[in-house]
């Protein structure tokens, strides 16, 4: 083989390598009218995003490669934008190769502070994966009875369900953001809904947990916001006491915390929470007795309704993206562009 031919082959290989390792996009443009995604998660196995259409109470499935999408409607809960329930959170049973997707539906009056109610329908739904336009829940539960039980035990009524997480056995945990900090537990088969944990709030308009996630490496459930930055719970028992996590670093204000997600980094877990305009990461070496933190921000997130962080992948490349609901659009404002903004993923490295 001639020397020039070898050089040409090497150049071609170099070009291919560069294309494989091309940088992740600075933003991913999701163009769906009136989407208002309060939560977004990426299914690495199927290479699609699941997004919660807040006001319509639907699951939006978006393929970033083909820029195509479809909706999944929940009978009796979804609407055209003015229904009794709104979709506030999504979670996968496992990070990779997940067999189930879960959807949290809050009551529309929960966060309507001008006409607020702690009662009314709110629900939780389990879907088999993969999804199609015709997918229906495998099972669904409502929270009114467990709210009544919390009220009897604690003297206050939690409401405003915002996010869910699943443990190794497939049990689900759903966080309440309003009334008081509380977590309901739903059995893997959806047949039992029970009071799992609660505590006194620190006052204010939103005393409960704003987010919740599960760390499979430590077998701990972690709540975000409310009384403190992080609170850990032991899922090995039917009821759990809140375990405050000591934060090593300057967390800042509790006001404005939103959702939190577990991101796998090597064989460990890093948690990343949203509090506009910051994405805040947490790493623990002592089973969540304490945690170190890092922060990153983007100016676009200051007034975008930044509510969640999603980890996204192109091949072996891992990135973090900020999810913005753009609440100012309302249910029928006509907005059709809901960008996901790339974050500095060095906050994953401790």
From Swiss-Prot:
Subcellular location: Secreted, Cell wall
InterPro entries the record matches: Mala_s_1-like (IPR054550)
Top-level taxon of the source organism: Eukaryota
A Pfam family reported for this protein in Swiss-Prot or TrEMBL: Mala_s_1-like
Keywords tagged on the record: Allergen, Cell wall, Secreted, Signal
Single GO cellular component term: extracellular region
Signal peptide region: 1-22
Keyword Heme in annotation: no
Protein name: Major allergen Mal f 1
Organism: Malassezia furfur
């Amino acid at each position: 083989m001639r020397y020039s031919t070898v050089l040409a082959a090497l150049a071609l290989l170099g070009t291919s390598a560069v294309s494989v390792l091309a940088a992740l996009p600075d933003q991913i443009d999701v163009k769906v009218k009136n989407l208002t995604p309060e939560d977004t998660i990426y299914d690495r196995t199927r290479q699609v995003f699941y997004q919660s259409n807040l006001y319509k109470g639907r699951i939006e499935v978006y393929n970033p490669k083909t820029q195509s999408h479809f909706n999944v409607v929940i009978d009796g809960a979804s609407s055209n934008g003015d229904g009794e329930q709104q979709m506030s959170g999504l979670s996968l049973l496992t990070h990779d190769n997940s067999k189930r997707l879960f959807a949290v539906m809050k009551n529309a009056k929960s966060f309507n502070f001008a006409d607020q109610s702690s009662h009314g329908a709110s629900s939780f739904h389990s879907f088999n994966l993969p999804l199609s336009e015709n997918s229906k829940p495998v099972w669904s539960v409502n929270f009114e009875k467990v709210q009544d039980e919390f009220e009897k035990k604690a003297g206050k009524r939690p409401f405003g369900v915002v996010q869910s997480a699943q443990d190794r056995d497939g049990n689900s945990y759903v966080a309440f953001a309003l009334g008081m900090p509380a977590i309901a537990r739903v059995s893997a088969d959806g047949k039992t809904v029970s009071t799992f944990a609660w505590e006194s709030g620190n006052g204010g308009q939103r005393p409960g947990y704003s987010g919740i996630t599960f760390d499979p490496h430590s077998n701990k459930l972690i709540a975000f916001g409310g009384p403190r930055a992080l609170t850990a719970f032991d899922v090995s028992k039917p009821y759990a006491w809140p375990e405050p996590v000591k934060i090593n670093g300057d967390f800042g204000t509790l006001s404005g915390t939103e959702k939190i997600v577990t991101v796998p980094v090597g064989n460990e877990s890093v948690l990343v929470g949203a509090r506009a305009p910051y994405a805040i990461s947490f790493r623990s070496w002592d089973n969540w007795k304490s945690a170190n933190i890092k922060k990153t921000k983007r100016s676009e997130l200051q007034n975008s309704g930044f509510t969640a962080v999603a980890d996204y992948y192109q091949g072996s490349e891992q990135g973090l993206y900020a999810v913005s609901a753009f609440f100012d659009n309302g249910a029928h404002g006509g907005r059709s562009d809901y960008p996901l903004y790339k974050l500095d993923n060095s906050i994953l490295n401790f």
